[in-house]
Regions:
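Bacterial Sec-dependent N-terminal signal peptides
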Residues: 2-47, 116
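Solvent-exposed, low-complexity, repeat-rich "mucin-like" stalks and linkers
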Residues: 37-69, 152, 165
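Serine/threonine-rich, repeat-prone extracellular segments and beta-strand-based repeat modules
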Residues: 69-102, 111-112
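Edge beta-strands of extracellular beta-sandwich domains
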Residues: 103-109, 229-230
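Ser/Thr/Gly/Pro-rich, low-complexity flexible regions
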Residues: 115-233
């Protein structure tokens, strides 16, 4: 037998040994993949909860699971609610899973005034901007639309505290509106609660009033700019 033939036979024998060796190993169907389960938090009564002004706020509850395991006891709740003051309060529920990954959800608690019966919801047009900064002379917002939406008696959202300055007049689009919330009192007064815009400006003040005879809304807004606007349907 030649050396070449011996080499070929040896290679076949080695291959057979390797095959037998692999076939004799137990395969349990598992691999090195690992799945982590984030904590899933479910809010009872949903992510928006109404509380009447002057009543007592009690958290409506929540449950949490990590995979199939109940981990409700691991949830941390943060955020205060003043049931004596109209406003929109954020309550956050958070938890960390066994691998150190965090998850959270937020509930908006709306403290409303049941004594407020007037609803000023609607889409209004800007009819004047008297007393405003000169930027509103260079970029007129007259004729732009502003939508007020009642969330609960005495609580409203506003589509744009800047009356469409960037969103419409300058033409950047709705993403550049200054949205927000305000409280509406039974005396027809308006008080700003919060605002949000792409530049994260802080609300200095928002005051105003509604005239039930004319149906007009007047707002004095100071959020980066000073805008005094009258709105009419």
């Amino acid at each position: 037998m030649t050396f070449k033939m011996k080499k070929i036979i040896s290679l076949f024998a080695l291959a057979a040994f390797v095959l037998v060796g692999f076939s004799s190993c137990d395969y349990d169907g598992k691999d090195d993949a690992y799945v982590t389960h984030y904590v899933s938090i479910d809010l009872k009564e949903g992510d928006t909860y109404l509380v009447a002004k002057g009543s007592t706020y009690t958290d409506p509850g929540y449950t949490a699971t990590e995979g199939t395991e109940d981990v409700t006891s691991k949830v941390t709740v943060s955020g205060d609610v003043d049931a004596n003051k109209m406003g929109i309060y954020n309550v956050t529920y958070s938890a960390v899973n066994k691998d150190g990954f965090s998850a959270s959800v937020t509930r908006k608690v709306l403290v409303y005034d049941p004594e407020v019966t007037t609803n000023i919801s609607g889409t209004y047009k800007v009819t004047s901007t008297d007393g405003s900064q000169s930027v509103f002379d260079r970029y007129s917002v007259i004729g732009n639309s502003v939508t007020l939406t009642q969330l609960a008696p005495g609580l409203y959202s506003i589509s744009d505290y800047w009356a469409g300055l960037y969103a419409v007049t300058i033409g950047y689009g709705a993403a550049y509106a200054c949205t927000g919330y305000f409280a509406f009192g039974k005396d027809n007064s308006i008080t700003g609660i919060s605002s949000s815009d792409p530049w994260n400006n802080k609300m200095t003040s928002v005051t105003g009033s509604y005239d039930p005879e004319t149906g007009k809304v007047k707002m004095d807004v100071i959020i980066s700019y000073h805008l005094v606007m009258e709105l009419a349907k």
